[in-house]
Amino acid sequence: MQKKSEITDINGTKKDIACLSCAIVNRNVTPPGALPVSDFFDAHQDYEVPIPGFIILASKRHIQSVDEFTKEEQQDFIQFLSRLRKAMRESLGIEKVELIQDEDTRHHFHMWLFPRYDWMEEKFGRKIESIRPAMKYAQENMKTEENL
């Protein structure tokens, strides 16, 4: 049996879950900014960081890395990723995005589609190491109805 963890969503609601990605895929929790899903992947706004357009693209099954994708998942992934990125540009006007594959998980492959806004560069710089301070700033200062 998987150990449960307590998470706190961007509204301050606490939930006990074993696997956040499974809880999202099975709709046991509803993340803010729920987006379309594909046959093999789910996309949603980050559960704790209220930056508009910050998308987590996660596998529906338990894998950690792209080298575990089936052929069908490989094809679905690139098409879904392209569709999400296009929507970020067209709907939100996001011109720059950092794609970060994070294998620091026990359960689901996931990739961050992290939008780069002018305020981030002004406050924290442009380099990749500026992402964490921008996320922390958003958690502390951007929990507004508009960003949820």
What are these regions (language model features)?
Residues 1-148:
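HIT superfamily nucleotide-processing domains
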